[in-house]
A protein has these predicted regions:
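NTP-handling and nucleic-acid-processing catalytic cores
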Residues: 2-135, 214-248, 289-290
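Active-site neighborhoods of enzyme catalytic cores
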Residues: 2-54, 149-153, 158, 169-201, ...
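A glycine-biased structural micro-motif
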Residues: 71-75, 144-158, 163
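Short regulatory "switch" loops immediately downstream of catalytic or recognition motifs
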Residues: 80-81, 199-205
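Anion (oxyanion) recognition and catalysis
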Residues: 122, 162, 181
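Short acidic beta-strand-loop surface patches of small beta-rich interaction domains
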Residues: 136-141
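A preference for well-ordered globular domain cores
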Residues: 184, 204-216
C-alpha cells in the first residue's frame, strides 16, 4: 500500500496543536537577524543562522564538498564542552545541498527541527536529538533555557554568545516565515509519528507509476489544460518538490483514523473495531482534504 506510519519531520502548528500540510502554510516576509558565530573559541568553523535556539540540537556542520575553505575539515568530529550549558558533538560533513554563498558557507545541522537537515541526517546517518516541544518551548538546557519559549531562548543564547566573545556578526535580514493558514501560528518543524502517503512508490496496478507520475500524466497527454498556461510551471515545480503527504491531524473534527493498537504495538486496520478490550483506537483524524478525496 501507499499509506504508512512513520516518524518524520512534519509542519507542526504550536498554536493549533496539530500537523498541517505544506499547502496550508502561508509565508510572511518578516524582519529577522542572521547571526554568525562559533560554537566555542577553539571550534574551527563559523556558522550562520537565523535560529540560534536550535543550535543546541546541532550534531554536524555541513559544507559543500567543493568548497576549498573547508576541505581539510570534512570527516572530523569536534567535542564542544559548553555551548550555553550544553555539551555537543559536532561532525563536519560534505553535502551538495549546502549553498556555499550563504553566510559562511557552513550550515549547522539540526535534524529534528528542519526538513532539509532531517534529509541530511538520512544521507549521513546522523542522530536526531529533539530540543523543542509541541508548545514551541525548549526541552533541554540549563534552567536559563529549559522550558523557555523559542523566542526567549534565542535572546538568551545570543547574549551568551556575545558575552563569550563568540558572536562575530549580526545582520538585519528579510525572511519568509512559515505560518499556519488558520491560526497564524509560526510553524515549528518537529519529528512526529504520523500517517503518510508515499508519493514516490511505484504502483504495480498502474504500470509501476508513482502518484507523482499519475499527477503529471494527464497534463503531458493534453487531457487537462492549465489556464493561464504560465501556471503550468508552478504546478510542475510543486509536483517535483512534493514530499510524502502527512494525512493525520490532531483535531476533533474529521474522520477518525480506522486503526487500533494493542499493548504490543500490533496494528489492526478496518472500519470496524477489533474484538477484545485490549485495543486502543488511534486518536488522530484524517486530513479533511484526504477525506474529501475519498468521495
Amino acid at each position: 500500500g501507499l499509506i504508512y506510519r512513520g516518524n518524520k519531520i512534519v509542519n507542526w502548528d504550536p498554536k493549533g496543536q496539530t500537523t498541517i500540510s505544506d499547502d496550508e502554510i502561508v509565508y510572511e516576509e518578516r524582519a529577522s537577524k542572521l547571526y554568525t558565530f562559533k560554537y566555542s573559541k577553539d571550534f574551527p568553523i563559523s556558522i550562520s543562522t537565523s535560529r540560534p535556539e536550535t543550535k543546541i540540537g546541532d550534531v554536524a556542520v555541513a559544507v559543500h564538498p567543493e568548497d576549498p575553505r573547508y576541505k581539510n575539515y570534512i570527516g572530523k568530529s569536534y567535542a564542544v564542552k559548553d555551548f550555553c550549558g550544553i555539551e555537543l558533538s559536532v561532525k563536519i560533513i560534505a553535502d551538495k545541498e549546502v549553498d556555499p554563498e550563504f553566510g559562511t558557507g557552513a550550515l549547522g545541522v539540526t535534524p529534528a527541527h528542519s526538513i532539509i537537515d532531517w534529509e541530511m541526517a538520512d544521507r549521513h546517518n546522523l542522530p536526531r536529538p529533539q530540543v523543542i516541544n509541541e508548545f514551541a518551548k525548549m526541552t533541554v538546557g540549563e534552567n536559563n533555557i529549559l522550558g523557555k519559549k523559542t523566542t526567549e531562548a534565542r535572546e538568551i543564547i545570543v547574549e551568551w554568545l556575545r558575552s563569550e566573545g563568540l558572536l562575530e556578526k549580526e545582520e538585519d535580514i528579510k525572511q519568509n516565515v512559515s505560518t499556519a493558514e488558520r491560526t497564524g501560528g509560526i510553524i515549528e518543524p518537529l519529528p512526529k509519528l504520523q500517517w503518510f502517503i508515499n508519493v514516490n512508490k511505484p504502483i504495480k496496478e498502474r504500470g509501476d507509476k508513482t502518484l507523482k507520475d499519475l499527477m503529471r500524466e494527464p497534463f503531458e497527454k493534453k487531457e487537462i489544460k492549465i489556464i493561464p498556461d504560465y501556471f503550468s510551471k508552478t504546478y510542475f515545480h510543486w509536483l517535483e518538490n512534493l514530499r510524502d503527504w502527512c494525512i493525520s491531524r490532531q483535531i476533533w473534527y474529521g474522520h477518525q483514523i480506522p486503526v487500533w493498537y494493542d499493548k504490543k504495538d500490533q496494528i489492526f486496520c478496518d472500519i470496524k473495531a477489533p474484538e477484545g478490550n485490549n485495543w486502543k483506537r488511534d486518536e488522530d483524524t484524517l486530513d479533511t482534504w484526504f477525506s474529501s478525496g475519498l468521495w
